[in-house]
Amino acid sequence: MKIKYQHGKFIFPEQISSSAANISCGQVGDATNQQPPTGSGVSVTCAEIQVSYPDLKNVEFYRHGWNSWSPTSWWSVTKPPYRVWNNPPRSLTAEDAYSDDPKVHQSYLLTAIKVDPEKDLIMLIGSLGGESGYFEIGEHLLTARKLPDKTDNSAHPVPSKCDKDSYVSWWVGTGTELSVFQAYAAALRKSLGSKDKRLNRYPGTIWSSWYSWFEEISEETIEAEIIPAGRSGYQVLEIDDGWEKGIGDWQPNAKFPSGLEALANKIKNNAMTPGIWVSPFIAAGNSTIVQEHPEYFIHDFSGNLEPAGYNWGDYYYGLDCTHPGAKTWLKEILTTIYEWGFRYFKLDFLNAAAIVGRRYRTVSREYAYQEGLKTIREALPDAYLMASGALIGPSLGLVDGMRVGPDTAPYWDNTERKQDPSGPAVRNAALNSLSRYWLKPLVALDPDVAFTRSRGSLLSPEVNELTQNLARVCGNFSCSDPYTWLTDSEKNQVREICTEFGMPPSVKQISRFKFRSGNEVVDFAPWLYPTERISDRILAK
C-alpha cells in the first residue's frame, strides 16, 4: 500500500480516504486527495506500507525502540541513526541485534513523521494487536513491514504482496502530535482485546535495593531497611539482583543464610508488599539448568547455544519459551518464589526470549516471547509484574508495569558512552521515558528510580527534583536511597513524597516535554535540550 505527501496534502488509497475500517492487501483502489479528519486514523491490514514525501527536507521522525532500554526519541534523517553505536554486546541487550543496521534509520511498533512543523501536523503509522511492526525511514520514503525473523536454516523468503503470513494490522493517522499519539494508543488498547483486563493496576511506592547497594546486598542490608522503609511510607520493598546463587540458579546465596521467606515475612509484618528481582528468561552458561538441560535454551542454526546478551562478565542464554520442559522449569522457579511470599516481581532481561534462533517449535520469536509471558502469568496470577528489558508491543496486556527507558544512575550523563543513548544516566532514562508517555493508558510506566539523597551521588538538588517530577509524570515513584544515607531533611522529603503517591498524581500533557502535575507545570525540555549553559547544575560521569 502506498501513501504520498506532496504539495501540503496526503494522497491516500481510496479505501482509507473513505474511512474504511479495514482493507486487505490486494484490494487497494485508486488514490484520491481527500484527507482523513485531524487526529483520526484507520486500521488497515497488509504486508507493507510505503509513505513517500518528496517535497520534505530534513524530516523529523519518531524513533521507537524495540525493548525497554532501546533508544527512543524524535530524531532527524540528516543525523546518523539513533541507536547503540558500534558495541555488539550492548546491542544484543538494548537493540534488536538481528534487524539492527548502522546505516538505516529504524523504528519498531510505530513511527511518525512531522510533515508540517508550523501546523504541528504529523503522520503516525503503528502496528496493532501487540505485534512489533518494523520501519525504515529515509529522506523521502518510509517503509513499514513485519519484524524481520528467521525460524529455520535459511532466512525467510521475501513475502509476496499477498502472503498472509506477512500481513500486519496497522493503524494510520494524521493530526497534531499529541492528538495522534492519543488516538493510536486508544486504537492499540482496543486491539489488545481480552488482554486489556490487566491495565490500571497501581503498585504503590517502592523501595529497591539496586541503585545503592547494587549486587552487594545481604540479609543484613535488607533487614536494616525494612522498618525505616515502612515508617517512611513505602508500600513495596523490592530485593534486587544479588540475592541469587547465580543467573539461572534462583535460590538464595550464602549472604542470605535465613532464606528469603523470612525476609518476605518481615516485609509483610511492616505493612509492605514483598518484592523481588528475577530474570527468568536467561541463564548463565555455568548455571545448573544450562548444564543439565541445554535443550531448554535457544540455539543457533548450527546447533550451538545462541548468546542472548552480555552481563556479569560473560554471555548469557535465552530461554526457549516454546519448549515444554522449559515452561515447566519456569513455572517451578516462579511458584517457589511466590510461595516464599513475594507478590511484586521485577522481571528483567526479558528480551532474551525473543532473539532469533532455533526453538523447539517453529514459531515467530515474538510469539515465543508471549508464550513465556503467558506462562509467567499462569504461575503468578495475582502478582504484580513489572517488566524490564521487555518488548514493548508484545508485552502489552500481559504485564502490569513496564520499564520504558534505560537504567538511571546517580549522575546526569556518562560522557564515556555518548554514543550509547541506552547507557545508564538520568538524561537517557528521562528522555526515553518521556518519549514513551503516550503508553500511559496502556501500561503502568516505570521511569526507574527517583533520587532524594546527596550521599553517593553526583546529582544536584535540582536534578534530584527533576527525577521526582519524572516519577510524578509517569505515575510511579520508586527509590533506592538507604535510610542511613539520608539527612533529616531528605528523610522528611521521602515521607512527603510517599504520602503524595498514596494514589498516582493527576497529570496532563501540555506539549512534548511539558506537563501539568497537580498545580505545577513541569517542563523537561530545558534540561534535555538546553539552550543555555547548565553545567553548573549537573555533573557528568
Each model region followed by its residue ranges:
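Residue-level signal for short, function-critical loop segments
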Residues: 211-213, 280, 478
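N-terminal accessory beta-strand-rich subdomains and adjacent acidic, glycine-rich linkers
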Residues: 1-187
